[in-house]
């Protein structure tokens, strides 16, 4: 049973997924929403062009609930992390726009979740970091790889080994966040940001562009022509 309460609902073509688990939205299960549940919801809501992920209340998520580590064996922790990694890989490869609305603390697994999104809109009071080294471990859900791709290998290495917690402005200067907002505006600005991107394009166009860029990142060569053909058929094949 997943003890993290994650709610997803639709606002027109924009879906909002909210993480809720106490004041700090701790991730007591790496699979903070069941992967199959998320995919089923998106299948049942085919009008969805964008997904915004946020944390309820003051914080996005302070990451793993480390108090549970003592009660679990290494094997069960590893199995749970594999589920969490698979979920974040799924979010990263969704063929729709994904935006994290980062309010307050966004640490460890919380930042790993945010980095699985294509964009991160942060409150001016947000703090972000992969802080796992403080607890004697390293990020286990793909966060090291994603951070390296986003900010570069050298900056990622320094951040991870020092467990550095960045201000929103510093994260912006490094390219870790897309935009910094006023203290309480991260979520409304993220919703507006998503709406501005998707409002004038079709779902076919969104799918084509995102799938092409994902394939390029994954090492596939020349994936763009198939995407062009898909949009060509939609635009002129009637």
Q: Can you annotate each of these PLM segments?
A:
Residues 1-56, 89:
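Conserved CoA-thioester-binding segment of acyl-CoA-metabolizing enzymes
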Residues 121-126, 177-223:
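C-terminal long alpha-helix characteristic of the crotonase
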Residues 53, 65, 113-115, 171, ...:
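Hydrophobic/aromatic residues within transmembrane alpha-helices
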Residues 32-33, 40, 47, 55-89, ...:
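Glycine- (often His-adjacent) and acidic-residue-rich active-site loop
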Residues 63-64, 147, 155-164:
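Short helix- or helix-capping micro-motifs
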Residues 119, 158, 162-164, 170, ...:
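Well-ordered beta-strand positions
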Residues 88-135:
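Glycine-rich beta-to-alpha active-site loop
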């Amino acid at each position: 049973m997943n003890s993290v309460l994650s709610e997803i609902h639709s606002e027109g073509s924009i879906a909002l997924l909210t993480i809720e688990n106490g004041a700090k939205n701790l991730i007591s299960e790496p699979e903070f929403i069941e992967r199959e549940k998320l995919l089923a919801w998106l299948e049942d809501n085919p009008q969805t062009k964008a997904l915004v992920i946020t944390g309820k209340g003051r914080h996005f998520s302070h990451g793993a609930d480390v108090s549970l580590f003592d009660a679990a064996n290494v094997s069960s922790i590893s199995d749970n992390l594999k589920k969490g990694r698979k979920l974040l890989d799924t979010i990263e490869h969704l063929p729709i726009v994904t935006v994290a609305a980062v309010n307050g603390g966004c640490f460890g697994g919380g930042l790993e979740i945010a980095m699985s999104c294509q964009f991160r809109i942060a409150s001016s009071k947000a703090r972000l970091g992969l802080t796992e080294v403080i607890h004697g471990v390293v990020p286990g859900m793909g966060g090291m790889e994603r951070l390296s791709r986003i900010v570069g290998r050298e900056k990622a290495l320094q951040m991870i080994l020092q467990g550095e917690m960045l201000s929103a402005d510093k994260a912006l200067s490094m390219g870790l966040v897309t935009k910094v907002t006023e203290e309480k505006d991260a979520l409304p600005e993220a919703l507006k940001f998503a709406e501005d991107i998707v409002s004038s394009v079709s779902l076919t166009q969104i799918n084509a562009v995102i799938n092409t860029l994902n394939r390029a990142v994954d090492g596939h060569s020349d994936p763009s022509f198939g995407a062009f053909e898909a949009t060509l058929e939609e635009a002129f094949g009637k």
